[in-house]
Amino acid sequence: MQKYMLEARQLLALAIPVIIAQVAQTSMGFVDTVMAGGYSATDMAAVAIGTSIWLPAILFGHGLLLALTPVIAQLNGSGRRERIAHQVRQGFWLAGFVSILIMVVLWNAGYIIRSMDNIDPALADKAVGYLRALLWGAPGYLFFQVARNQCEGLAKTKPGMVMGFIGLLVNIPVNYIFIYGHFGMPELGGVGCGVATAAVYWVMFFSMISYVKRARSMRDIRNEQRFSKPDMDVLKRLAQLGLPIALALFFEVTLFAVVALLVSPLGIVDVAGHQIALNFSSLMFVLPMSLAAAVTIRVGYRLGQGSTLDAQTAARTGLGVGVCMAFCTALFTVTLREQIALLYNDNPEVITLASQLMLLAAIYQLSDSIQVIGSGILRGYKDTRSIFFITFTAYWVLGLPTGYILALTDLVVDRMGPAGFWMGFIIGLTSAAILMMLRMRFLQRQPSSVILQRAAR
């Protein structure tokens, strides 16, 4: 029991800074929306439309680079720290290649925006302008993630937290300057949010690089002074590990976007109630997601040390802590659901619907916690391909079709509206949790030599 308590303390020490960093990053999006809304409703809508396209694109790159964390954790645990700098350098090359792809996609996103039904031309122009300003921050964001993953792979999660707050503090005044045109800058409205956020990502990157170069704990693994060409073998391995994570993230984000589109014709009350419940549940999701990042680090480190039993301890402890967190957040959601909904809106019909949907959100928080921590465990074992297949099957083959049938058809029961989609979420997330646990048990029952060989690749 003592070893589990010790592991839980180490996991929480890693996870808490990640939680705070995630809150800071989420707050940046909130600040953009509020400040753009203060300028005009059209500009706020333009930022919302642009963000809905930006997020799937940038999260694809973000997911691809998550492969670095278990690789670095494993090298650190095995005492091969001299190889970490080369992996990080190749991570920068990968980030550069993906940045170009993302920038090309975002530059041409105007075709998607202008094809939307009945979109106002002025709104479309502002949304395109916002994206074309923001896309210049894509390399800065992804380079920052490489440096952050280096730190987190070495069990240093506080730098990411600090840089997240630096980004938030810089974002507010720079937003103000470019939205309203102060200090000789042009008045850009919502487009100014894109300029400011792009600049902030570069500030976060240079701040993180400055820390990495000066940190005593990383003195022995600093990047070599000489230029390093792309190493195709390393890049291929990182891509093989990262691509399934990237696709899983992409399909998860697009799932919620598709549900939002399917709910939109049901009316203002249904849309508002759905959005309130989804926004709050997304906030609660930060807790298990951050714990999953910590579990990836601990499992990778223990496998690097050559101890499959300690890796199992880290995995079980992460699941135990995650389940406890889920029960707490579910109880909080059930008890205060009406008060939470009132923070968003005062329409009685919206409050009633949002409160009902939050009950369903409370039910799936346990499954959500298990599946995301399970995903973190599998990343630690470098078994990322199964993550993609599990999430795709659970969300798109089981969850979304079931939700559609329950919400918008009479095939099984009378049309349930938004609640039907939330029943689909419960089915999808529960399926993902079960499949993740089955895959984890399958991996852990393999011979130690097989597990360690896979981890060392």
UniProtKB/Swiss-Prot annotation:
Q: How does it sit in the membrane?
A: Multi-pass membrane protein
Q: A GO CC term? A: plasma membrane
Q: Does the keyword Transmembrane helix apply?
A: yes
Family annotation (CDD domains): MATE_NorM_like (cd13131)
The record's listing under InterPro entries reads: MATE_fam, MATE_MdtK, MdtK-like, Multidrug-R_MdtK
Domain of life where this protein originates? Bacteria
Q: Where in the cell is it found?
A: Cell inner membrane
Which GO molecular-function terms appear in the entry?
Answer: antiporter activity; xenobiotic transmembrane transporter activity
* Stored Pfam families: MatE
Question: Could you tell me the Gene Ontology terms of the biological process aspect for this record?
Answer: sodium ion transport; xenobiotic transmembrane transport
Name the UniProt key words of this record, in alphabetical order: Antiport, Cell inner membrane, Cell membrane, Ion transport, Membrane, Sodium, Sodium transport, Transmembrane, Transmembrane helix, Transport
| Regions crossing the membrane | 11-31, 53-73, 93-113, 127-147, 160-180, 189-209, 243-263, 276-296, 314-334, 357-377, 387-407, 418-438
Stated role: Multidrug efflux pump that functions probably as a Na(+)/drug antiporter.
User: What PANTHER family would the database entry show?
Assistant: FMN_FAD EXPORTER YEEO-RELATED (PTHR43298:SF2), MULTIDRUG RESISTANCE PROTEIN NORM-RELATED (PTHR43298)
Question: NCBIfam families per the record?
Answer: matE (TIGR00797)
The family classification in the record reads: Belongs to the multi antimicrobial extrusion (MATE) (TC 2.A.66.1) family. MdtK subfamily.
Listed name of the protein: Multidrug resistance protein MdtK
What organism does the UniProt record list as the source? Enterobacter sp. (strain 638)
